[in-house]
Amino acid sequence: MKNEFLGHSESHETILTLFQKHNDDVKQLVGISKTIATYRKYEVTRRHLAEFIRSKYNVSDISIKEISPMFITDFELYLRTACKCGYNTTAKFMQFFKRIIIIARNNGILVGDPFASYKIRLEKVDRGYLTEDEIKIILKKKMVSERLEHVRDLFIFACFTGLAYIDVAGLTQDNICKSFDGNLWIMTKRQKTNTDVNVPLLDIPKMILKKYKGKLPDGKILPVISNQKLNAYLKEIADICGIKKNLTFHLARHTFATTTTLSKGVPIETVSKMLGHTNIETTQIYARITNSKIGSDMQGLDKKFVGIEKIYKEVAM
């Protein structure tokens, strides 16, 4: 039994071996149906699992048949303590690990389900975003250098298109298309999920594209720099503009979801599609309805009760 647990029995496939086979398959699908980001997450999960097995059992691998509910909870504890992973990061790693267990069960390697009583829940994160007034401050502020002007333009472009950094960086003129309605759209694929992203261009992103048209090398349509430098320069812009929020490029995506679209009455189904989300629950995490939107909605509702208010006034006043 000890040899089986330690993965020494030839009749029992080991967990890290199966995990590696799975990751090799994912690697071959990168650029087809998987992204490099997904592959890397599986690789990191496997590495943490290998370190846990080595630390807990002093072996290099164990039999899949010995994976128990206790093993699952011990691995979670290891991620939270030894690896110092946050709640949601730990939950993501456990989701990737569960995928391997599902494969083992589907292939008859494992009969029971060690995850049966284990619930993976993600904490809701209050995503930051810029208000319309803060966007206006950034737009109006004179930038002290061309470098910061470029960064400001990229950030504002994302605030009005919702594109993530990697997708902005990959844009070419081929992605700017005249659609069925005669308007210009961005038509691309979201690299993270390989889903279609089609976004009608508002006037501000159109003006930004026009500003750089024919002025950049290598067929670029925007002055893209590395994400690391971009975020460093955004902190400079935040200081210049007196904005206290943590200004990152991804904040522009949250701003698009909240301030640019949902708060202006764009249906969440439409926003979800433009963001390239595969399910609407993801959009609900990103998007927060602002107080101004709540106020304007309730004002509109108030007008619909004018008749009832008159009745009450006649009776009670």
Roles of regions detected by a PLM:
Residues L301-M317:
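C-terminal secondary-structure termini that scaffold catalytic or DNA-interacting sites
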Residues I156, F160, I166-D167, T255-T278, ...:
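C-terminal catalytic core of tyrosine-transesterase DNA break-rejoin enzymes
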Residues V125-G128, E134, G170-I208:
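Conserved tyrosine-mediated DNA breakage-rejoining catalytic core shared by Y-recombinases
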Residues Y129, R190-N194, N227, L275-G300:
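Catalytic-site neighborhood detector that most strongly recognizes the C-terminal catalytic loop/helix
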Residues A37, T45-S55, T81-F115, I166:
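N-terminal DNA-binding recognition helix of tyrosine site-specific recombinases/integrases
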Residues Y87, A91-F93, L110, F115-Y165:
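Basic, Lys/Arg- and aromatic-enriched nucleic-acid-binding interface segment
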Residues S145, K215-K220, V224, A232-K273:
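Short, basic (Lys/Arg/His-rich) helix/loop patches that form interaction surfaces
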Residues Q191-K210, K215-E236:
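C-terminal catalytic core of Y-nucleophile DNA break-rejoin enzymes
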